[in-house]
Amino acid sequence: FLQYISYYHVAEHFFESIFWDDIVLRVKDRLTQPGFSYKRKKDLVSFIKYIVKAIDVRDESLTFSEQTALRLTLEKYIDLNRLKAEIDEYDDSLVSHYSSAIVSFSGGNTADLQGPDQGAVFSALAARIYKTRCAMVHSKDGEKARYMPFKDDHLLVKEIPMMRFIAEQIIIGTSSIY
């Protein structure tokens, strides 16, 4: 439990900055498109709808989708081929496990690390990781997806190596020598 959450926190540390960097780039791109005009109402309405869809307002502050921020973090720092190789070296059954088995206690979907569409792989990976994390930390009575200590440990143990190698790549990708 603690290992998974600790590795998740490595990625979570970068969520806000990566999410806002992505929004800023997308806004700049939309504003500088040749077909965009700040004088055309339909262009502005479309632009506003885009912004509203990308962010949430809660308690008078701007928030974002944590799962989207996780996906963006993975896209920025994770080399899927390297991740697959590291997981295979650790346990050569895990890559096929991730692609064929859901995380039953969380509803975490399959994630085919060998899939041809990197965007789809990162989305599936983010969903699997995020749903698993949520089932672990939001284990209210009555919730469908929740982690049960001891009972679900044998399932969680298969998710830890993936989180470890992801955390390691993020740490290496964000490190600098002074």
Task: Locate each region found by the language model.
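Amphipathic, oligomerization/interface secondary-structure segments
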Residues: F1-Y178
